[in-house]
Curated annotation (Swiss-Prot):
Bridged cysteine pairs (disulfide): none
Protein's UniProt name: ATP-dependent RNA helicase DBP4
Subcellular localization: Nucleus, Nucleolus
The gene coding this protein: DBP4
Residue ranges of every copy of the Helicase ATP-binding domain listed in the record: 79-253
PANTHER family: RNA HELICASE (PTHR24031)
EC number: 3.6.4.13
Gene Ontology biological process: rRNA processing
Amino acid sequence: MAKNLKKGKKVFNKSTRKINRLKEEEELAKLQERINNYDPKTDEASVSQFSDLPITENTLKGLKEATFVSLTDIQKKTIPIALKGEDLMGTARTGSGKTLAFLIPVIESLIRNKITEYDGLAALIVSPTRELAVQIFEVLTKIGKYNTFSAGLVTGGKDVQFEKERVSRMNILVGTPGRISQHLNEAVGMETSNLQVLVLDEADRCLDMGFKKQIDNILGHLPTTRQTLLFSATQSESVNDLARLSLTNPNKIGVSSDQEVSATPESLEQYYVKVPLDEKLDVLWSFIKSHLKSKILVFFSSSKQVQYTYETFRTLQPGISLMKLYGRHKQTSRLETTMKFSQAQHACLFATDIVARGLDFPAIDWVVQVDCPEDAATYVHRVGRSARFGRKGKSLLMLLPSEEEGMLKRLKIHKIEPKLMNIKQKSKKSIRPQLQSLCFKDPVMKNLGQRAFIAYFKSVHIQKDKDVFKVEELPAESYAASLGLPGAPKIKIKGGESNKEKKNASRKLIALAKTDADGEVQTGNEKVRTKYDRMFERKNQTILSDHYLNMTGNKVNSDGESEDEDFMTVKRKDHELKEEELPDLTIPVSKRQAKKALSRKATLASKGNPTKLKFDDDGVAHAIYELEDEDDFIKAGDAKKQKEEFVNKERETMKISDITDKEVERQKRQEKKRKRKEIERRMREEEEEDFDNEQTVVTLGAPDLDRDLQYDNGSDVEEPVSKKPKWFEGGDDDKSKNTNDGFVEYDEPETLEDLESLTARLIGN
């Protein structure tokens, strides 16, 4: 008998599911055919919107809801080639839409390969900073909301154990190099054998920030059959080296900086101003006061300068909302600051180069660089925070007189020619007296100023381009006075390990290196000397004093003994000895030693030096290292050709060995993970067994038929069981019974407490 279905309810049977599945396969086959037939030379002109691309309906729907309609130049060139599954190396200006250029191919690749939540990690996106990783993840969730993939974000500053428990169930993983490398090494369930796509965003920045070891570790965990997409705003030798290691026959897309009209957006107005070092804060204060209705991003070279400038300007209150952002901030604070500045209409953000890459802050009016960037590429990325996606923007670069000539030459190579801006003395206001007052009143502010001073000089000292950065020409005393300090602090510059490597080093490993054999942390503090220790170390001021010994003539040596107590004295020294008086040290002391020495000499003389020979196919013996005659060498060919043949032969051998070594290393890592997984499984089983073996002890009270045989009156509310009073307590249920004949009956007391209670009751009665 058929069941009556509610109106509007859909029924899916097996035939309907089969029809839908076949329909999806036909659509994917048509899209794949369009991708294979795509020719960049002829079809690129006809592609102007996302709807013209061979992508699925769900992706188009997500793009439309996120208001992404038109394609940029880099997206036109890269997305169709990336959809074919080929490796790609894309270079374009900042703010040109590189994020969508790799997110769309990632989503489409997983759809065509029919990746589900049970297939594990299929796409990995690596970003240099946490803020950029968060931004990529937000865009991914917007355009991929109609797909059924699981995506995760892993960055520093979060709970590692929480991420480890869930990272194995992710299909798409976005994160920073350090945290991704940690999960690949430690997460037991994280498998990369099914990885389809690897994306390296801002690859040059990943290498510049000291993440080379982490990137190499990530590449070592991934299969070689993957597709790799590498994107950056600038190309460098390190990026090319990384491309050779991780990409296979890559398509290099994007116009190089030599052929471009300019490496910066055309809608960006660029200016520079020549400012002495001791007037930088005055110029910055005057600039902020004259642009209170603007959104300003200010770059410094160190986090200490950001902290000092933020605290002092916040105290002076310029009339605009001030914010700060640098690497040592906690992750929650960094995200909160990023969101506030993005939503603010008029604000000023003091930051380091942590926000110079990839972050899309909407409607930034001015980008001010208080400190000179380390190179032209850093300048391009800094000013790229403004004038994004065709909007207008302005940038201002402060240069010292010693930096002006060298920096402008390096910018001119990249077709960047900022205009000189002159500052009127009337509009410039000095805040040096206010800063001196703050540092005098507040020791914390003075300490911040000293640390900012030292950080700036160190940042200039470590720069590689000595033609631009000349630390010996910096006016230390006048700069310290401009910060409000009474004098220039002493600077200790330590050599050795790179600051970037120190910053990215694991703090757990550093703490572990300071422990002793027992695992306890060693401290550099010496043992505390008490007054009793000093008393026992005190020298006698009478008999053993130096003055007393000099007067009496009894000198004491270092061992505390008097020199007069010696019974032997030296009569002469350094005199010539006769050869007849010297003993013959070569003669053996005993007959056994003499016989042994003679037999060893005889054996060595008869054997000679050992030689090792090798035999050819004809049985002729040859030495291991046999020199070739000049005639035979000439017959073999030209020396250069022989050298090239030898190098090529060794290169092929090294390639084969490299593949073998990588496979062995991968198997070792997999075996380590399997062992760790087995240990965790056994621990869970032992915990379950212990829980099952726990015995529940039930204590039974005295039987009470009246209470046990009570019938339920139908109420759902259970009445609380009243505690039965003891025999010595008062009440109606007291076990004491008063009879009419004047006698009182009590149970026999068993303990001392019962006896004392009985006595108290009798006295009371």
